[in-house]
């Protein structure tokens, strides 16, 4: 017997990435898992390297980043890889979630996998926010001040929580130290969650497929077929990432963060990184501070209710015309929210933001269940007519 199948550790690896039987009809939309694992690997390696040269201090943080850029061998490359792979990570995660919503990956028996995936998204957002504060430019300082201040919306204990997070009465050395410690820790938590995500998927029925039906009658081993298929998208990913890192490394960043943090001067507009903009737009679209914070967190957790609100008898929207139209409206609405999150709080962006927020929540709690019931009824009527 081969050592791969007899060794206690290697046989686990073998069962997951070598002999694992995958549906033969998987499209390239099922390649995001390997790309996201690659992104996480790049982030951990570049992050640990950056941590060796970074100083989490109000007076030295900005200078230590400049030191990495100017004095450390290939420090500029490590930093730009880290910042641009973060954007790639979120871009691929949103595509991964979109594919899951389109093909009904949240339905039984993959509900646990979907729930763990939602937790991964929340941890990713927390990690990204903590990391954005560390260079300690203008946007870092004011972004940290604005986002941590959201906790003050909690009745009675809000302000105490904010000061507990800061470790003082404003963003200071203690804040940077704890943000750095947590930013260093959370990627390893992410890796553990990703492993749980994989185990939850493999220990139920494995990957879904574009048809949304059982693929037990036609499967192929993961190696060499799907490893080669994954390698194709990995090479494309490296080409695109290299274009950003070498030719436009700051295209997805904010120029304000190249100005050293100054608590006495507020930047013209305080906006987070592009991948957090839709949720920032939802936060700003509700005038009440507490309700805005609740809505922002609810917007992420809304993904958790999809297994409950989708009442369709079919998995996915690929064979459901009404749901397909509604899904594409939801995607367009999400992109509109992303644009509005970057705009100033003024007319007409306030009104557009409020309309888009209503559409966003309506999709999960109203539109999906209503449309799926209509489609179920039409299918049943059609079936009775044929028989």
UniProtKB/Swiss-Prot annotation:
Could you tell me which InterPro entries the record lists for this protein?
Cyt_b/b6_C (IPR005798), Cyt_b/b6_C_sf (IPR036150), Cyt_b/b6_N (IPR005797), Cytb/b6-like_sf (IPR027387), Cytochrome_b (IPR030689), Cytochrome_b_C_euk/bac (IPR048260), Cytochrome_b_N_euk/bac (IPR048259), Di-haem_cyt_TM (IPR016174)
Segments crossing the lipid bilayer: 32-52, 76-98, 113-133, 179-199, 226-246, 290-310, 322-342, 349-369
Question: Which residues are involved in binding heme b b566?
Answer: 96, 197
Do you know which Gene3D superfamilies this protein is assigned to?
Answer: Cytochrome Bc1 Complex, Chain C (1.20.810.10)
Cofactors required: heme b
Residues annotated to bind heme b b562: 82, 183
- Assembly mode: Fungal cytochrome b-c1 complex contains 10 subunits; 3 respiratory subunits, 2 core proteins and 5 low-molecular weight proteins. Cytochrome b-c1 complex is a homodimer.
Q: What is this protein called?
A: Cytochrome b
Q: What is the lineage of its organism?
A: Eukaryota, Fungi, Dikarya, Ascomycota, Pezizomycotina
